[in-house]
From Swiss-Prot:
GO terms for molecular function: scavenger receptor activity. Residues 503-551 are annotated as: Disordered. Belongs to the CD36 family. It comes from the Eukaryota. GO terms for cellular component: cilium; dendrite; membrane; neuronal cell body; plasma membrane. GO terms for biological process: cell surface receptor signaling pathway; cellular response to pheromone; detection of chemical stimulus involved in sensory perception of smell; lipid homeostasis; pupariation; response to pheromone. Disruption phenotype: Mutants are viable and fertile with no gross morphological or locomotor defects. Residues 1-7, 481-551 are cytoplasmic. This is Sensory neuron membrane protein 1. It is found in: Cell membrane. Residues 29-459 are extracellular. The keyword Transmembrane helix applies. It is a multi-pass membrane protein.
Length: 551
């Protein structure tokens, strides 16, 4: 039985082409299409529910820099810092007052963060530890007045001495008081300078202060931010254009900010950091608007990574070098004067928060080496202080992330305020925070079995088809080669039979040398019948036929 070589060749070739086109072109497009239809912020969708009410808390860590030599620093000495932490909190995020705009394909919402102290994870710390930090009201207030309203320095100095009697440049207080419960601000004095100073509390300019009665306030770094509005966003839902999913369109009902000198720095780039569009390319980066910095930040691809056995991409970010990067000059106080730009690895938050604060990576990681040298007690390293995100591009899922940021006081001596007149000029770290998330198996399995299982099946199928098709192509090539290099055995047998038939009809030839033959051969008569005779009964004829057959 012969194998149909042509059919085998055509079938194997078709299988090979199908495996290539389906496995690398058609299936990925089908998968991306299915994901794009599922991953939207359309009301009623699973993604919308997870996005609006995160069903699990994020981990929020606070590390505080305790100043161990406050009196010496007040006289100009180099600060010695002791890192205390982490104080661990469960951070719950939810969005409320949602309003959809079907025509614009957007949804507006108010973001709310709630911090709940986790005593078990914080051990051995309890939150009642006493910390020494720069006075959070007196130092920023005095420095701001000196820079912006020097003519009011005498009035402010007198008011501070009344509101904070016997105050020093550094304040010793419990951690929970400094960050959540609040330190007391007494505005009960009727003295003009004190009343003038307290005006900023009554008008709400000091956002970290909470009024408890007509004459007293409580100031804390994060107390007012706990379980309260952190801004109103308007973002794209991604129904009409999935590539715009989560893109910030407005913040505080404004299409752009009015904070920085240049319009480019005031634009919103990226999402609200709680959702990302699927199908991103690794070189696109992960951009998000951060209200705490009044700025959009972009994480860039670093290397491949994995999470619970699933492949992902590792992204990282830093604050860059504003002075060296022309695109970032709009974050300088004066874009035309580079001397007003902050040092490498830092960002001036004065325009954003209204005080002499600087943002940086923890321990000034990736910052100007001078920043680290100006104080004792810092040890910047990638493992503990870098920002990272392990991200799955096709589904737009962040598997794990750690967003880290340090807040520093841009400190300088203040001549008009006695406790501050000898302070050194430097950027003093106060505390840094980490907002982290690690998806558990409940949520990673959703990605694993809806995305990676399909990809695995497709991979097995396409490579199996390619293997079978290559085997078929090689076997058909072998058959074609065998056909051209050898003769078919049946054809050989048929040719031999034809030769035998032809040979049986031919007469023997006379010997070329009569001397070598002792037999006399009779003369062959023509094969015709003589009239009146029958060769079957003619003895002579019969004798001749028998004689010929013997030869």
């Amino acid at each position: 039985m012969q194998v149909p070589r042509v059919k085998l060749l055509m079938g194997s070739g078709a299988m090979f082409v199908f495996a290539i086109i389906y496995g690398w072109v058609i299936f990925p497009k089908i998968l991306k299409f299915m994901i794009s239809k599922q991953v939207t912020l359309k009301p009623g969708s699973d993604v919308r529910e997870l996005w609006s009410n995160t069903p699990f808390p994020l981990h929020f860590y606070i590390y505080v820099f305790n100043v161990t030599n406050p009196d010496e620093v007040s006289e100009g000495a180099k600060p010695r810092l002791q890192e205390v932490g982490p104080f661990v909190f469960d951070e719950w995020k939810d969005k409320y007052d949602l309003e959809d705009d079907v025509v614009e394909d957007t949804v507006s919402f108010t973001m709310r963060n709630t911090f709940i102290f986790n005593p078990k994870e914080s051990l051995p710390l309890t939150g009642e530890e006493e910390i020494i930090l720069p006075h959070p009201i007196m130092l920023p207030g005095g420095i701001s007045v000196q820079r912006e309203k020097a003519a009011m320095m005498e009035l402010v100095s007198k008011g501070l001495s009344i509101v904070f009697p016997d105050a020093k440049a550094f304040l010793k207080a419990k951690f929970m008081d400094l960050f959540f419960r609040g330190i007391n601000v007494d505005c009960s004095s009727e003295e003009f300078s004190a009343k003038a100073l307290c005006t900023v509390f009554y008008t709400g300019e000091i956002k970290q202060a909470k009024q408890v009665n007509q004459t007293h306030f409580l100031f804390s770094f994060m107390g007012q931010a706990n379980h309260s509005d952190s801004g109103r966003f308007t973002v794209c839902r991604g129904v009409k254009n999935n590539k715009k999913l989560g893109k910030v369109v407005k913040f505080a009902d404004e299409p752009e900010q009015d904070i920085w000198p240049d319009g480019e720095c005031n634009t919103f780039v990226g999402t609200d950091s709680t959702v990302f569009a699927p199908g991103l390319k690794k070189e696109d980066g992960l951009w998000a608007f951060t209200p705490d910095l009044c700025r959009s930040l972009g994480a860039y691809y670093q290397h491949k990574s994995s999470y619970h056995g699933m492949p992902s991409m590792r992204y990282t970010l830093d604050l860059g070098d504003i002075r060296a990067d022309e695109k970032l000059h709009c974050f300088c106080e004066d874009p035309e004067d580079l001397d007003t730009c902050p040092p490498k690895g830092t960002m001036n938050l004065a325009a954003c928060v209204g005080g002499p604060l600087m943002a940086s990576m923890p321990h000034f990681y990736l910052g100007d080496p001078k920043l680290v040298a100006d104080v004792d007690g810092l040890n910047p390293n990638e493992k503990d202080h870098a920002v990272y995100i392990d991200f799955e591009l096709m589904s737009g899922t962040p598997f794990q992330a750690a967003k880290r940021l340090q807040f520093n006081l841009d400190m300088e001596p203040v001549e008009g305020i006695e406790p501050m007149k000898n302070l050194p000029k430097l950027i003093l770290p106060m505390f840094w925070v980490e907002e982290g998330v690690q998806l558990n198996k409940t949520y990673t399995n959703l990605v694993k079995y809806t995305l990676f299982l399909g990809l695995k099946i497709n991979s097995v199928l396409r490579w199996s088809l390619i293997t079978f098709s290559l085997v078929g192509l090689m076997f058909s090539a072998y058959l074609f080669y065998h056909k051209s290099d050898s003769l078919d055995i049946n054809s050989i047998l048929k040719d031999n039979n034809k030769v035998d038939d032809v040979a049986s009809t031919k007469e023997p030839l006379p010997s070329a040398n009569p001397k070598q033959s002792s037999t006399v051969h009779p003369v062959q008569l023509p094969n015709t019948l003589i009239p009146g005779t029958n060769p079957a009964t003619n003895p002579a004829t019969h004798h001749k036929m028998e004689h010929r057959e013997r030869y």
